């Protein structure tokens, strides 16, 4: 039996989960070949849930991060199908948990897409980056929201809060964790941003932003300025942390009977803003987002539950526009290609018509010659 045949049989044995057959074929020198899609025996064993076959192939030295023609690894296959045990054995053998396929989707994206909660938890346990975005600017959390899977969304949201966003695609994203003390330094003294409920984490970027404690603390810190009978003075207060944070600067300006809080950073999303305690707030508060988003005004006498609906981040808008442009370009190219094929077909048809006309003319001439020869022969016989 040739090596090509041995390789084909190894693929079929891996697909069927025939461990003994896999061992025999490898002992006889079967190569670790792939099919026309680049699928290896390990891909097939992982896809079809054959745990023992997967272990046999891994011990034999099959590449744990082999790629198909669309850059999918065995881990992608197992995660997509929900085979948690195979996902774990691949990760224990050193498979790349953050490997991306042609769509820039990781195993976590695919497990979330198919609602495999056990696999999602396992991937997070082994260090999967929950901030990674696909080619369509979607994180695993975005996919869970799109699919309406609240349980997965909660798991992923907790993981995002516990992970520092080191995604190179979002360099402006800054995360300040609750463990990092935050203070405001200004004329009103040093104010700790942590409120009685312990809400002190402020996260800038694509995740939710908690600003309730910040608003209350800023208003309380600047209250002496607004109650003073002296000439209004513009006071600037800055947020400092125990660690250096360059991306988040908050300013409070008290002038003209209002308190204006400006959060200076890139790509801030302000989610649902619930009620703010009335204690310590004597004047309206205006929150201005720096990227052209809405302004929220909370009167001191009528503080109610407000919801600010912000536009999509510039990065996501740009990504969507790029995808739309690519789709339009692809449609234009497809129409042009079809038009070229149609023109070519018309030219071929015209050429065939001309050839047919020429053949008909030749046939007519030949028929006339035959008739002339027949008349001549008839005349000779009559003579």
UniProtKB/Swiss-Prot annotation:
Q: Answer yes or no on keyword Amino-acid biosynthesis.
A: no
Q: Which Pfam families match?
A: Ank, Ank_2
Q: Where is the signal peptide?
A: none
A single GO molecular function term of this UniProt record: transcription cis-regulatory region binding
What are the entry keywords? Acetylation, ANK repeat, Nucleus, Repeat, Transcription, Transcription regulation
Presence of the UniProt keyword Nucleotide-binding in the record: no
Tell me the residues on which N6-acetyllysine occurs: 69, 340, 369
Q: How is it modified post-translationally?
A: Acetylated by EP300/p300. Deacetylated by SIRT7, promoting heterotetramerization and activity.
**SMART domains xrefs:** ANK
A single GO cellular-component term from the record reads: nucleus
Instruction: Enumerate the ANK repeat regions by residue range.
Output: 5-34, 37-66, 70-99, 103-132, 136-166
Where are the N-acetylserine residues found in this chain? 2
Q: Which GO terms describe its biological process?
A: mitochondrion organization; positive regulation of transcription by RNA polymerase II
What subcellular compartments does it reside in?
Nucleus
The record's listing under SUPFAM superfamilies reads:
Ankyrin repeat (SSF48403)
Q: How does it assemble?
A: Heterotetramer of two alpha and two beta subunits. Interacts with HCFC1, causing repression of transcriptional activity.
Q: Show the PANTHER family listed in the entry.
A: ANKYRIN REPEAT PROTEIN, GA-BINDING PROTEIN SUBUNIT BETA-1
Function, please? Answer: Transcription factor capable of interacting with purine rich repeats (GA repeats). Acts as a master regulator of nuclear-encoded mitochondrial genes.
User: What is this protein identified as?
Assistant: GA-binding protein subunit beta-1
Annotated organism of origin:
Bos taurus (Bovine)
Gene behind the chain: GABPB1
